[in-house]
Amino acid sequence: MAEFFAAPFWTDFLWPLIVMVAQSVLLLVVLLIAIAYILLADRKIWAAVQIRRGPNVVGPWGLLQSFADLLKFVLKEPIIPSGSNKGVFLLAPLVTCVLALAAWAVIPVNLNWVISDINVGILYIFAISSLSIYGIIMAGWSSNSKYPFLAALRSAAQMVSYEVSIGFVFITVLLCAGSLNLSAIVEAQHVRGLGSLIGLPWLTFLNWYWLPLLPMFVVFYVSALAETNRPPFDLVEAESELVAGFMVEYGSTPYLLFMLGEYVAITTMCAMGAILFMGGWLPPIDLPPFNWVPGVIWFSLKLFFMFFLFAMAKAIVPRYRYDQLMRLGWKVFLPLSLAMVVIVAGVLQFADIAPK
């Protein structure tokens, strides 16, 4: 037995595989529980803006409402439309949900708290968010109905339009941090930035990129809303107008998987906002008692702050028309983000403050 545990097969392959699977399962459980309460927070925030209580029946203060909704969806019978492509129809929500969950493999919630700390973390996130379009197109095409298909095409056009702007946002952060590794980007906001330049390195929040890259932070925030089909850019679903968009033929567990994938993608974008612009797990002030708080708590607070901005946009901003949405993406955000890339690169080069 001792020889087996000392063998290269165990030490180099099997044991790291077991650890990675255990980490993945733990992350999945924590993430799903967090999604349940983020969904509840979304409904509570929306209710508070409209001066009502929101979910308050299931459990104390409605805390178990999301689990009751889960049970309701699971117990319903899935109905597959006649004439639809059954395999693709059932595969589409699974693709959407799995891709959304896969993005969390590279997101660090604290120092060294990440499943796979790859050196191209931003590129991986960008690729995963691009692949999510396939699940939507598969759902629209396989439903054998013109309405889901048209909604899927609208969604694909919308997501592609705003991925360009998000790509330029990533490039800007890459220029400032000098790395595609998400952990390295967070550490760069600890050692370099405005606070360090003015001689106050302990004011960590001045080192974060939200201040020098404020226009790009706004572009990222609005583009993330459009990328995840959130109000005021929920033209694909538009609850009060189009019923359910490309999900109109779905019900039961497949519909639940689509909703789960949507909220996981929203949480991923919130996490990326916290990492790229708010210092990830870093405290706002690198002095006691702030640096006594575990980094995962700071990361969670920043993530929830980003989600609060998402929820407030849903509650107070009216829905855009489709032509307004496309005009904003191609005629405003694309030139602005491209200009910011050039400006940031020029400032870093001529001020000789580019990362070495």
Curated annotation (Swiss-Prot):
InterPro entries: NADH_UbQ_OxRdtase_su1/FPO, NADH_UbQ_OxRdtase_su1_CS. It is an enzyme of class 7 (translocase). It is a multi-pass membrane protein. Its EC number is 7.1.1.-. PROSITE patterns: COMPLEX1_ND1_2. The keyword Transmembrane helix applies. The chain crosses the membrane at residues 18-38, 87-107, 120-140, 166-186, 202-222, 265-285, 292-312, 328-348. Keywords: Cell inner membrane, Cell membrane, Membrane, NAD, Quinone, Translocase, Transmembrane, Transmembrane helix, Ubiquinone. It is found in: Cell inner membrane. It catalyses: a quinone + NADH + 5 H(+)(in) = a quinol + NAD(+) + 4 H(+)(out). One of its GO terms (cellular component) is plasma membrane. NCBIfam families: PRK06076.1-6. This is NADH-quinone oxidoreductase subunit H. It comes from Nitrobacter hamburgensis (strain DSM 10229 / NCIMB 13809 / X14). The gene is nuoH.
